[in-house]
């Protein structure tokens, strides 16, 4: 893979990670404020969109997928917290 292409992919990975962190911050805030609908939105956005995109980018570089696994564990913990709080 060309260096320039690799550099762009690495930059996009960092951007995705920042976006995931923003959604995690918002999710934690919504759970603490007992806002179910926005919290569910952030869970879905992280799970269905951002993590898939990150995983695809990591696959392109054939690198370690541990960041995706760490984010999934963190998301599952927050999802369980939300489920117990909203149900």
Task: Annotate each PLM feature.
Residues 1-21, 30-32:
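Short, charge/polar-rich alpha-helical segments
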Residues 45-72, 80-87:
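Amphipathic alpha-helical coiled-coil segments
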Residues 14, 21, 25-28, 51, ...:
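Alpha-helical oligomerization interfaces characterized by heptad or quasi-heptad repeats on one helix face
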Residues 9, 16, 23, 39-42, ...:
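Amphipathic coiled-coil alpha-helices
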Residues 1, 15-16, 33-34, 45, ...:
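Alpha-helical protein-protein interaction elements
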């Amino acid at each position: 893979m060309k260096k320039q292409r690799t550099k762009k992919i690495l930059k996009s990975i960092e951007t995705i990670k920042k976006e995931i962190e923003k959604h995690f911050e918002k999710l934690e805030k919504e759970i603490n404020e007992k806002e179910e609908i926005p919290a569910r939105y952030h869970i879905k956005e992280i799970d269905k969109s951002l993590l898939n995109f990150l995983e695809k980018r990591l696959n392109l570089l054939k690198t370690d997928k541990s960041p995706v696994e760490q984010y999934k564990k963190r998301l599952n913990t927050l999802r369980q917290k939300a489920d117990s709080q909203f149900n």
